[in-house]
Amino acid sequence: MDAPVSFSLGAMGPLLRKLDSLPVAPEIRLPEPLKDGIELLKEDLEEIGAALVEQSMVDSPSHRARYWMDEVRDLSYHIEDCIDTMFSMRCGGDDGKPRSVRRHKVGRVKVDGFSKTQKPCTRLARIAELRALVREASERHERYQLGDGRASSSSSSSHRVFTAHGQVPAPCRNLVGMDEPKTKLTNMLTDEAELHMKVVCILGSAGIGKTTLAEQVYRKLRWQFDCHAFVRASRKPDMRRLLGAILSQVQLRIRISDTSTVQSLIDNLWEYLQKKRYFIVIDELYETATWDIITSAFPEDNNCSRIMTTAGIEGVALECCSYHSVNIFKMIPLGLDDSAKLFFNRVFGSEQQCPYELNEVSYRITAKCGGLPLAVIIIAGLLASLPCKTELWYNIDGCLCSSVTTDIDLDEILKEIISLGYDNLPHYLKTCLLYLSLYSEGFIIWTADLLKQWISEGFIAVIDGEDIEEVAESYFYNLVNRGMIQSVKTKYNNQVLCTVHHTVFDLIIHKSKEEKFISAIDYSQTMPGNSLEARRLSFHFSNTRYATEVAGITLSQVRSFAFLGLLKCMPSIMEFKLLRVLILEFWGDNHGCMSFNVARICRLFQLRYLKISSQIIIELPAQIRGLKYLETLEIDARVTAIPSDIIHLRSLLHLYFQDGIVLPDGIGCIRSLRTLKYFDLGSNSEENIRSLGQLTNLRDLHLTCSAPKSNQQAKRNLVILASYTGKLGNLKSVKFSPGDSGMDISFLFYGIGISVDRSRTASSLPFSVRTLELPSICIFARLPDWIGQLRKLHTLNLAVRELIENDIDSLAGLPDLIVLSMHIMKAPMERIVFNRKAFPVLKYFKFICGTLRMAFQAGAMANLHRLKLGFNAHKGEKYDNILVGIEHLLNLKKIAVRIGGAAEAKESDRMAAEAALKEAIRKHLMFLDDLDIARVECVKEEYKCIKKKHKIKIEDSISEKNGDSKKQHSVEKKAVWGKTMKNIADSGVFPEDYTMSREQRVAEGFVVGIEKCRAEDAAERIIRNVPVDYDGLGQVSTSKIQDHLPELAPRAVQNEKFGSSNDLSIMIQINKYARLPSYEWRDTDISKLNFRLLRAPMLLEAVTARCHLLDLILIGSNNITVLDLGRPTITKLPASIECLPNLRYLRLQGTQLKSLSEVIVKMPTIRGLDIKNTKTEELPQGILRMKKLSHLSMGEKQKNIQVFMEKMQTLAETVQDSDDLSDETEGIADDEGEFSTRANASTPKVDEDEVDRRANNFIARFRKQITIRNSGFAKKESSIDERLWIRDLDECQLSKRGGRF
């Protein structure tokens, strides 16, 4: 096992490995003298390296020994820097051949020290100088006589402790001695007789469990308040961050602006909390000044609001409670029994599993912990890592004796035990723990980020065959189990947030400074002396009042730099030369800085880790291929552009950009990639999606679809993705989430999702997948069969339109499924039953559906801890058996329920559902720790809530158009909403691929003309968003709206009582429908139906092929206005068509009709006739008598079009469609004779007198408008004069001219 970078050995281990590999590196050809010099240097370093290891294992080294170790560590860093400077000037090109950095012109900036290759003689002389320094250090070691030090048995241990797959052992989560304090504190906070805002403070020494108690009470009570927040302060709190955290929790989905000041945050909090019942927890208050600032943000009202604080100083506690000592809850240490119980749980699992010979010493050690839970946890973590040998345990007991005196000081006991726990850590764990001093006190850290930083720093030592990330994870959980790191929150997907207890933080800050490992500087500190030559440096300059630029620090040697604060305090990147880790989190100020240029990072050739978080736009360099060691690139900010050569970063492991970013084509070239977040299916090319199949090392794939060009494109991209993911044999996690802007797949509403047919996207996901999250953005028609084949699945989150019992059975057998989240769009007809032994290891279950019908049999979900439910209350529904068998969930700890309201449901219905649910839980789950039931507006179903969302969007758009949202616009909002829903419902009657013309919508009466906008233009606007075909002027003539309304239209058909689906049972129940599709109907079906109110049947092949069925429907349907017979099975018109006195629109497109019956000309109400793509070549002469015919659509077969242009008295406008000429003119005419036209701008002008003469003749002959669509006639030369003749009318500007025919 190679030695990693460590605080005790410096860079000695990596340096020796580097010197060992240099002479044989294929990309560097070294002359023999230089190879010999490198070999001699390595031998010298190995000698002093061995002495350094010996000294690092001494318990209490002398001052002289410390001085020598510091010198050798610095020397190892210095030599590695020199080696990197001399030999890291080359980077691989596209073809893998070595090229100089100058060839790439990185950033077009000259790089000092790297501009040209050093001569071999120069490098040989430099190696000789380094050898001289090493020999001097070796001589001082002999002169100081440092070879007699004795190694510590504890600190010399290199034993590594691993935990199973990143899980904190179950005993770590067991709480001891909390029941009684929790009950008392809860009673203090829930006294409803005290209406005024009340403050309760938990007082106790460090490590006694104040935070744990506050968290338990907070989780229990928070749902009883309108809003709530839990934040942690510190001894040097960042007030802006603290107040921003409160505001973001009480006012969800708010984004704190960079320009927000402390006072503006206080004002926003004060305003938002007015007249609200709030519950705020402020943990770890140290100063009254901090409390004075925070409390000014909370209005003192009579809404029973509560604030809970924790403090270790009695004066601070009294100040918080306005010196009402009765509101101070004083915590007392654990008794010996509780301390022993906690100890045994942590070490052995229970006291019964403790070896007999260790029982007595265990009680002795526990008694010396002073009843402090943190002390017990740390000492238990120490002993759990040691062999169960009596002598070792008694040695630990002996070390604790000095901590216990007759006058017990709990703070000193805790410090002593923390110090003992630290001293007994292996060196590799000490290094990782000390690295946390890079962050400020109380900072919440994402574990995933921390592990990647450890790896980039070189702290992780791996043995052949081990995965470096798994080893890093084992380091982390080892420190958690030892109590050195605290897990703040573990999300359902196993993402962990962590921090460090302030007492532990004090220790690692002290040790880090002592070892010159990390220098952390904040605005309140003077510049420490050891920061001048720091290798790892962090700045915390978030206070706008005191933050200033730092001077006097040399940055060229800094290897790791973390910056948190105002952008103006950020040092120039040009000053860094050897950075390996760069962490930037900055914000602007009131001066309006909008962007930050980090193009100079292309100089940092040793960079391994780069993370930038900001609301400011980041300008990346145009090229970064010179960063050949870069492993993590994470930009949590908007960027101007992605470097085009990012695909050439051969060492890149983790790539993160915000959603919506278009990655350069060829992303599959980064074969080393393990994490890709986010890959946008909407903006990336299909070729780039295919290239994902080349990322054979990919483990975590985060997908989004922020802005697809169309719903069809999104579906097509999903199919492409599914066909290539099977090649990713190492894939463990697939997550699909909507982008920040949502996924706009419809012109009508926002972010519904992609409707996915499971047969079309049959998954080729590898069996290695452990996490699959496909939430409501991707909706399956049914649960895909292939999900049951993913036997290693750990987390599953998906949405399906419909769920049946067999689907649950296929999931119940997954052996490793721990997290299951399901969103069911269509309410099941039968109760969902979870059978005995179903989901044996499931711990988290979330189920969202319009109705709550489920039952748990005995033995189902035996290990379930958290249950989240969401459903809608319905009008008049009874909830006697709302959760059948919930008493069988014996390990359930937390329940969260959201109760919405279905259509027509009242508040009383939601209250009834809530009362029934609480009663069921109270009766059967007395042991429950956390119950959260809340009434919400609506739980998303297939139709109801989407409808409301669309309605809100319409109202907002009208308000925006008018500049406000005053009441005078309510009529307009209502009118627009009504028209929209009619068109949506009309779409829902038809199948997905059915196309509708704008004339059909006008004939239905859904779209009417208004001033300056005729009905046809209004219809064109409605169907504009989903075009299928265009007319000559580029206007949409037909559309497929159903394809873009997978959620709304089908349910709108039923809920608006507008049409009916193919579900015969529903149709018979409603018995009132205006529009009707028919599929596989039989004679017996039709006999059950009443067609009296039918207005628009859509008759498919099953009916049109049988004339007697068609006659059965049409006879007696006097209200039919639209009739679609456009099916190839129609060879003649049914005789019953003459029984339709109100028919306005007749569609015969695609039929086999050879001629039109004279019956049609006897129907004076017809306004639209579509005979395109039929075999009809001649039109009946009687068609000239159809006075109301305004739309006639014909094809090439109608050869007698010229006759109608000359003879048809009602012709007001002729339009010829042509793919070549694309000419069309549409007119407006009414019964008053008003007429105007719009013409193509390219129309050639003619003589004005001729135009006037033609116009007068035109108006004299015709009084109404007709639009004739012909797909082939416009290509004939004979039609050119007629087209120009019509176009010329536009120049006449005809209005109020002419009269009745």
Swiss-Prot record:
Query: Can you tell me which family this protein belongs to?
Result: Belongs to the disease resistance NB-LRR family.
Organism in which the protein naturally occurs: Oryza sativa subsp. japonica (Rice)
| Presence of keyword Repeat | yes
Look up the domain of life of the source: Eukaryota
Write the protein's name.
Answer: Disease resistance protein RGA5
Originating gene: RGA5
User: What the protein does?
Assistant: Probable disease resistance protein. Resistance proteins guard the plant against pathogens that contain an appropriate avirulence protein via an indirect interaction with this avirulence protein. That triggers a defense system including the hypersensitive response, which restricts the pathogen growth. At the opposite of cultivars Aichi asahi and Sasanishiki, the cultivars Nipponbare, Mokoto and Hitomebore don't recognize the effector avirulence protein AVR-Pia from M.oryzae.
Q: Give expression by tissue.
A: Expressed in leaves.
The segments carrying the LRR repeats are: 604-627, 629-649, 650-671, 673-697, 728-751, 790-813, 861-885, 1020-1043, 1060-1083, 1117-1140, 1141-1163, 1164-1186
Cite the InterPro entries for this sequence.
Apaf_helical, Disease_R_plants, LRR_dom_sf, LRR_R13L4/SHOC2-like, NB-ARC, P-loop_NTPase, Rx_N, WH-like_DNA-bd_sf
